[in-house]
């Protein structure tokens, strides 16, 4: 699996996930829409969202745009 892993809106950097990591995720804070920064990467399970945080998970190559 290959996931994007940079904070910019238009991300071009990616990483190859390790064994056991079968999910790509994207997290961002819903309060900061103008200066939106993302956390992206690979995970074994979908990370849990904190208050006011949006988490999106998927399981195909570079799906965490």
From Swiss-Prot:
InterPro entries named among the record's database cross-references: Snake_3FTx, Snake_toxin-like_sf, Snake_toxin_con_site, Toxin_cobra-type
Record's subcellular location: Secreted
Main location class: secreted
Tissues where this protein is expressed: Expressed by the venom gland.
Any one GO molecular function term: toxin activity
Paired cysteines (S-S): 3-24, 6-11, 17-42, 46-57, 58-63
Assigned keywords, A-Z: Disulfide bond, Secreted, Toxin
Source superkingdom: Eukaryota
GO CC terms: extracellular region
PROSITE patterns: SNAKE_TOXIN
Function description: Binds with low affinity to muscular (alpha-1-beta-1-delta-epsilon/CHRNA1-CHRNB1-CHRND-CHRNE) and very low affinity to neuronal (alpha-7/CHRNA7) nicotinic acetylcholine receptor (nAChR).
Family named by the database record: Belongs to the three-finger toxin family. Ancestral subfamily. Orphan group II sub-subfamily.
Designated name of the protein: Weak neurotoxin 7
Organism of provenance: Naja naja
Organism lineage string: Eukaryota, Metazoa, Chordata, Craniata, Vertebrata
């Amino acid at each position: 699996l290959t996931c994007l892993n940079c904070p910019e809106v238009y991300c071009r950097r990616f990483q190859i996930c390790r064994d056991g990591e079968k999910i790509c995720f994207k997290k961002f804070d819903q309060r900061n829409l103008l200066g939106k920064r993302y956390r992206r990467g690979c995970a074994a399970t979908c990370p849990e969202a904190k208050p006011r945080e949006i988490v999106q998970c998927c399981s195909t190559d570079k799906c965490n745009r």
